[in-house]
């Protein structure tokens, strides 16, 4: 079934965020055709009384005026140039971006407003915007994170059915790094019993190093209502031998105990501390100045 794209205007572009390292989020699209079985957004879709089951990702809202709205919001006297996170609730470089170019337009607005931002994506299409990312990074802090939980072919195909292959994401990491963009990798989510073996984790870290990633972080799967039901249904189809284990782990909680989580993420931390390349030296950025008006 092909996705339906709904072209709709938005009233606001920036969303205030609490309890996170960033103050604002920006999502040029709503919905995502990647349809990852573990996607945490399904939980929020269920809370909003929207489909969180297999129908999720079949209808994508395209915020056609998002760049214009963003320009107005960034132009307010009250704007403090706080960090904006792009892609917290949808992938900004899913296939629709190739046609509508809303993410690229938003990056240009952020660059023009000297506003720092970070991007989280599974989409290699981001390399198309290297020119804008370079311009923006000369004015403010810019970070791009690729989500690459595993390089295991079967795990990727069954849990991230609509995404680009992990190795193509690594190639995008290399191209961004070669262009001087601060790029890292998020191993999220790591799936207990499927992608948490030490050799699997180290494989990702070593590949990240070879591609030029300068940072890495890892999170273990968590399952809230809406996500839990869909994930377990998909697990029963693709990994039936794992269902009993996951039901025991997650039946009464969304997050695993800290000790279990640490036992999975600690090898990543140790490997990344010895394998990853150092961060680039901070660039010297010019102060923002008033642009001349063209009448």
Predicted feature residues:
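Auxiliary Fe-S-binding modules of radical SAM enzymes
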Residues: 1-9, 15-16, 193-295
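Conserved Radical SAM active-site core
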Residues: 1-33, 37-145, 149-157, 166, ...
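Surface-exposed amphipathic alpha-helices with a cationic face
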Residues: 134-137, 173-178, 269-272
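Amphipathic alpha-helical segments that form well-ordered structural scaffolds
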Residues: 69, 109, 175, 263-271
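A structural motif
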Residues: 114-115, 181, 213
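Conserved strand-turn element in the central/C-terminal portion of the radical SAM core barrel
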Residues: 151-155, 160-162, 175-197, 221-223
């Amino acid at each position: 079934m092909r996705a339906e794209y709904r072209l709709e205007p938005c009233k606001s572009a920036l969303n205030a965020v609490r309890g996170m390292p960033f103050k604002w989020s920006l999502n040029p699209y709503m919905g995502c055709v990647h349809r990852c079985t573990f996607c945490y957004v399904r939980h929020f879709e269920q809370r909003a009384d929207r489909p969180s089951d297999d129908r999720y990702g079949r209808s994508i809202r395209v915020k056609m005026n998002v760049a214009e709205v963003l320009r107005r919001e960034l132009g307010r006297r009250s704007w403090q140039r706080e960090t904006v996170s792009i892609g917290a609730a949808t992938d900004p470089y899913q296939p629709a971006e190739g046609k509508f170019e809303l993410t690229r337009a938003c990056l240009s607005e952020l660059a023009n407003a000297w506003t720092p931002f970070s991007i989280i994506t599974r989409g290699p299409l981001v390399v198309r915007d290297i020119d804008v990312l370079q311009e923006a990074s000369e004015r403010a802090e810019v970070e791009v994170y690729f989500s690459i939980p595993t390089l295991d072919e079967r795990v990727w195909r069954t849990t991230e059915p609509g995404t680009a292959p992990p190795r193509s994401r690594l190639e995008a990491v290399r191209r961004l790094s070669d262009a001087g963009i601060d790029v890292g990798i998020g191993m999220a989510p790591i799936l207990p019993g499927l992608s948490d073996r030490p050799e699997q984790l180290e494989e990702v870290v070593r590949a990240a190093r070879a591609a030029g990633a300068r940072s890495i972080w890892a999170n273990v799967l968590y399952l809230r209502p809406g996500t839990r039901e869909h994930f377990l249904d998909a697990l029963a189809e693709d990994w039936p031998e794992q269902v009993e284990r996951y039901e025991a782990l997650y039946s009464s909680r969304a997050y695993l105990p800290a000790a279990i989580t640490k036992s999975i993420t600690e090898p990543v931390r140790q490997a990344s501390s010895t394998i990853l390349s150092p961060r680039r030296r901070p660039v010297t950025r010019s102060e923002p100045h008033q642009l001349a008006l063209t009448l």
